[in-house]
Curated annotation (Swiss-Prot):
<feature type="binding site">
    <location>
        <position position="352"/>
    </location>
    <ligand>
        <name>Zn(2+) 1</name>
    </ligand>
</feature>
<comment type="subunit">
    <text>Homodimer. Interacts with RNA polymerase (RNAP), interacts with the Spt4-Spt5 complex. Does not seem to interact with the RNA degrading exosome.</text>
</comment>
<feature type="region of interest" description="Metallo-beta-lactamase C-terminus">
    <location>
        <begin position="578"/>
        <end position="636"/>
    </location>
</feature>
<keyword id="KW-0255">Endonuclease</keyword>
<dbReference type="Pfam" id="PF07521">
    <property type="entry name" value="RMMBL"/>
</dbReference>
<keyword id="KW-0238">DNA-binding</keyword>
<dbReference type="InterPro" id="IPR009019">
    <property type="entry name" value="KH_sf_prok-type"/>
</dbReference>
<protein>
    <recommendedName>
        <fullName>Transcription termination factor FttA</fullName>
        <ecNumber>3.1.-.-</ecNumber>
    </recommendedName>
</protein>
<dbReference type="InterPro" id="IPR033769">
    <property type="entry name" value="TffA_KH"/>
</dbReference>
<comment type="function">
    <text>An RNA nuclease, it bind single-stranded RNA (ssRNA) with a preference for U-rich sequences.</text>
</comment>
<feature type="region of interest" description="KHa">
    <location>
        <begin position="3"/>
        <end position="70"/>
    </location>
</feature>
<dbReference type="GO" id="GO:0004540">
    <property type="term" value="F:RNA nuclease activity"/>
</dbReference>
<keyword id="KW-0694">RNA-binding</keyword>
<dbReference type="InterPro" id="IPR022712">
    <property type="entry name" value="Beta_Casp"/>
</dbReference>
<dbReference type="GO" id="GO:0042802">
    <property type="term" value="F:identical protein binding"/>
</dbReference>
<feature type="binding site">
    <location>
        <position position="247"/>
    </location>
    <ligand>
        <name>Zn(2+) 2</name>
    </ligand>
</feature>
<dbReference type="InterPro" id="IPR011108">
    <property type="entry name" value="RMMBL"/>
</dbReference>
Length: 636
């Protein structure tokens, strides 16, 4: 059946290509159709031709050279340097003879691409190698280098994975698509361990696979993967909406226990979730609480990950097409639009989203081709969950920092490495640069620095204002001199014993990491301030402190339990959240186009989810459901 489809596609391609094009072979690689040719320049010079063929066959098409026409790598390197302007600042060139691609890493990748792709086409024409152009981040990133190295070293294995996947995807559906159902396997009427299982007569897809970092035990920390209808053997695809551990943290487990299929996400999500998963493993090891997977399973997931840009339509199963749209939550966060069958049903899973532009990101997308079912988060769905404006939140932060510095104190801001940390860095950089906040050192601890490096490698995912600032004004706030990377415990002691300063450190809920160590050092001094800017889950130390706990039993540096008396100033500043508040959630339902027929709510405490569902139904007369974990809902 697959061979019949491939032969049909080949015939269409051959009929449409000019006769002088020498096609060596056509094959499936994952969701793409790859054409290997002995004279690729003829095709690449006519971009509209391939675009039109792709539209006709409804598949993504990649053009590569046949191995027989590839230039010797050493000669190709010299030729590439002749073609590409020196201003591009090429940092590395490597060759993948499995895919016949040349990987070019540069500080200014746009100059390697050239106007309308002109420079890239020259590289193909003169060397035969198909250029794959990557940005060299201004901040060196160990994670990005490890991922790129893994993909280079395992290119042959990855091609085999993609070919097998291509054969799986490009089959004709066996059954009519007359039903679709969703099973809540985590993150429903709760926050954490998000996991949603989509079943159709032909396919099985998992949307997110997270952990609850504040769960306490295995029963409450991990998704319900033991439901009878779920098996790894039957799973066609996994979609990860964004990198936070409550959405991606349990993904390596699937590979540990036999899953060998694809993961779909944006490129920033792949990079960031790899960072967070490796850190999760490291912390668990240090705390002698091993996880049910290890580093090699993270590596395996990287090899199976297929990255997609926003708006890129991709076949992920014989009867399902996926398109990712901006969610505005963190870098690379996405809403997943799933087109089931020949349009019999369309659903959107929002993941976590922010329906407001921030300094860091654009507002979440709200226009889709079709929607029958919307699965939407409800983190701040309670009627009282109205957050102040960003401007007001920033003023409140400045006020708190100013008063603390006047007392000679230090400001500890526990943050997630990804999202709020970068938002705050942009705010602090501007206010210190313009003199609104006194120039004091801002210490960056934990994974935040590495996460910053990933942000600098993916500027196309940042807000337009920030992109303009970086590219047109030459000002990148992430590499400002006010920020200092913390290296090791000795430096942390110097910071807490030193002059007034601002400390940004993980974890965001004080559930571990270096922020907890800073808290223990600083909490008994009333001159210091602890500022919460993000969500504090029920059961976390952060939530207990918010509730007013003044005596906190924790292990000290000698691993002995002692009670810490909290005397520092505690401040919670709403408005920096990467989640939509109550007004934004209601506005999103009002503005989304087209209107869904039904809405399922997830990712919210029990009463907030129910409160939001009731309000949506009363206001918009749209059917709403609030499934519990383990419940299944038929959506078609």
């Amino acid at each position: 059946m697959v061979s019949e489809m491939l032969e049909e596609i080949k015939r269409t391609i051959m009929q449409r290509l000019p006769e002088r094009v020498q096609v060596a072979k056509v094959e499936f690689e994952g969701p793409e159709v790859v054409i290997y040719t002995k004279n690729p320049e003829i095709i690449t010079e006519n971009g509209n031709l391939i675009r039109d063929i792709a539209k006709d066959i409804r598949k993504r098409i990649i053009i590569r050279s046949d191995r027989s026409v590839l230039m010797d790598p050493e000669k190709a390197i010299r030729k590439i340097h002749e073609i590409v302007p020196e201003e591009a600042k090429i940092t590395n060139i490597s060759f993948d003879d499995v895919t016949c691609e040349v990987i070019i890493e540069a500080r200014k990748p746009g100059l390697v691409i050239g106007k309308y792709g002109s420079t890239s086409r020259e590289i193909v024409k003169n060397t035969g190698w198909a250029p794959k152009i990557l940005r060299t981040p201004p901040i060196s990133s160990e994670i990005i280098e490890r991922i790129r190295r893994t993909l280079r070293k395992n290119s042959k294995e990855r091609k085999k994975i993609l070919q097998q996947l291509g054969n799986r995807i490009h089959q004709k559906p066996k059954y009519d698509n007359d039903w679709a159902r969703l099973t809540a396997m985590g993150g429903f009427r709760e926050v954490g361990r998000s996991c949603l299982y989509l079943q159709t007569p032909n396919s099985r897809v998992l949307l997110d696979c997270g952990v609850n970092v504040a769960g306490g035990d295995d029963k409450n920390s991990y998704p319900y993967l033991n439901v009878p209808e779920f098996t790894l053997d039957s799973l066609d695809a996994v979609i990860i909406t964004h990198a936070h551990l409550d959405h991606s943290g349990f993904l390596p487990y699937l590979y540990h226990y036999g899953y060998d299929g694809p993961v779909y996400c944006t490129a920033p999500t792949r990079d960031l979730m790899t960072l967070l998963q490796l850190d999760h493993i490291d912390i668990a090891h240090r705390e002698d609480e091993p996880l049910p997977f290890n580093v090699k399973h993270v590596k395996k997931s990287v090899k199976h990950t297929i990255t997609l840009d926003y708006g890129e339509v991709t076949d992920i199963a014989p009867d399902i097409r996926l398109t990712l749209h901006n969610a505005g939550h963190i870098l690379g966060s996405a809403m997943a639009h799933l087109h089931i069958g020949d349009g019999q049903h369309n659903m959107v899973y929002t993941g976590d989203f922010k329906y407001e532009q921030s300094r860091l990101l654009e507002a979440a997308a709200n226009r889709f081709p079709r929607i029958e079912t919307l699965v939407m988060e409800s983190t701040y769905g309670g009627h009282e969950d109205v957050q102040p404006s960003r401007n007001r939140a920033e003023k409140e932060l400045v006020k708190t920092i100013y008063s603390t510095l006047r007392r000679g104190g230090k400001i500890l801001i526990p943050v997630f490495a990804v999202g709020r940390a970068q938002e705050l860095m942009i705010v602090l950089e501007e206010y210190i640069r313009t003199g609104i906040i006194d120039e004091v050192p801002v210490y960056i601890d934990g994974m935040i620095w590495e996460a910053n490096a990933i942000h600098t490698a993916r500027p196309e995912y940042l807000s337009k204002d920030l992109r303009d600032q970086i590219f047109h004004m030459g000002h990148n706030p992430f590499i400002s001199d006010i920020f200092h990377k913390v290296n090791g415990m000795d430096e942390r002691r110097e910071i807490v014993e030193g002059e007034p300063s601002i400390i940004l450190s993980t974890s965001g809920m004080l559930t571990g990491g270096n922020s907890l160590e800073y808290f223990k050092w600083l909490c008994e001094d009333p001159d210091n301030s602890l500022v919460f800017v993000g969500y504090q889950a029920e059961g976390s130390l952060g939530r207990r402190i918010q509730k007013g706990w003044k005596e906190i039993p924790l292990k000290d540096e000698d691993d002995k339990m002692r009670v810490y008396n909290v005397r520092m100033n505690i401040k919670t500043i709403e408005g920096f959240s990467g989640h939509s508040d109550r007004r934004q959630l209601m506005e999103y339902v009002k503005r989304i186009s087209p209107k869904p027929e039904k809405i399922l709510l997830c990712h919210g405490d029990n009463y907030k989810t129910l409160d939001l569902a009731s309000s949506i139904y009363r206001t918009y007369r749209i059917e709403t459901k609030t499934p519990l974990n383990l419940e299944t809902v038929r959506i078609q």
